[in-house]
Amino acid sequence: MIAIIDYGAGNIKSLQFALDKLNKHSIVTTEAAEIKQADSIILPGVGAFKDAMEAIRQLQLDSVIQEEAQKGKPILGICLGMQLFYEQSLENGDWEGLGLLKGSIKRISGEVKVPHMGWNTLDIQQASPLFDSKLENPYVYFVHSYAVSSFEENTLLASSQYGQLIPAIVQKGNITGMQFHPEKSGEFGIELLKRYEEMIR
């Protein structure tokens, strides 16, 4: 069972629909007991970092997520969910994240139109069970104004270019992040979710 954490930050219906297509049983929840019982966790989200962290803390789920991560449970963060994994965001202030990954979030370069919205290609940075080894620059769907700006280089699986390097897929142990929306990224996005679920079994 996959627990999709619902802290009021969107894109859950399309994500659950994508998982249903893969015959993956998921529940949408804010209950600590259900999250702890799940085989894996997905932290989705769109919107502001500060608001998301406040909602997660009010639900007392920050410590639950951190504890489950420490136990080795697979956790996938999508879009804002991926950004919440990091230590810090400089989005309209200086905000503390979940600290599951080292690094920080900053606004995308002012030289390009923000938000970064629409289809963009992925540049594969290192081999992973998530990809076919012969994969050539697939297109995925992004919607974001902030991006990971500092990170551990060995966690970067794939990136995109939009005025700067955009970390698009990161992974460290049981923690995986996707800055784009796999559930909105066509056949490749569905294949990514499928391979992710196969990888964490």
UniProtKB/Swiss-Prot annotation:
Q: Does the keyword Cell membrane apply?
A: no
Q: Which residues form the Glutamine amidotransferase type-1 domain?
A: 1-201
User: What are the catalytic residues?
Assistant: 79 (nucleophile), 181, 183
Q: What is its EC number?
A: 4.3.2.10, 3.5.1.2
One cellular component GO annotation, for this chain's record? cytoplasm
Where it sits in the cell: the answer is:
Cytoplasm
* Paired cysteines (S-S): none
One Gene Ontology molecular-function label: glutaminase activity
Which terms under GO biological process does the entry name?
L-histidine biosynthetic process
The UniProt keywords, alphabetically, are: Amino-acid biosynthesis, Cytoplasm, Glutamine amidotransferase, Histidine biosynthesis, Hydrolase, Lyase
Mind telling me which HAMAP family this protein's record contains?
Answer: HisH
Tell me, what does this protein do in biology? IGPS catalyzes the conversion of PRFAR and glutamine to IGP, AICAR and glutamate. The HisH subunit catalyzes the hydrolysis of glutamine to glutamate and ammonia as part of the synthesis of IGP and AICAR. The resulting ammonia molecule is channeled to the active site of HisF.
What is the name attached to this protein's record? Imidazole glycerol phosphate synthase subunit HisH
**What's the source species for this entry?**
Oceanobacillus iheyensis (strain DSM 14371 / CIP 107618 / JCM 11309 / KCTC 3954 / HTE831)
